Amino acid sequence: MQFLSISQRRKGFAEGDYARLAEQEMERARELYTEGFIRQIWHRLDMPGACLLWEAGGEEQVREMWATFPYAQAGMNEMLLVPLKPYAGFRPTKPPKTRT
């Protein structure tokens, strides 16, 4: 199952707080990507934060993995998690043509 997480920084933390944990945060993202849990990552342009496309068995698994990020462990980020389902408009509407 796929999920989209949308995170943003919490108020009350300085830029230096994020800078101190940035390398650890990126390393954890690389690990989860290599393990196949993270499919894609985007930085947000509207505010500091990120959007991640996850592949997991369920919402609880994503929340557990997200909680392993250094920013999450320090309470510096908050996250909205959206479960996704395939777009129905791409399914075939007619049976495939048979070759003769």
Predicted regions and their residues:
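Conserved, structured core segments of small domains
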Residues: 1-100
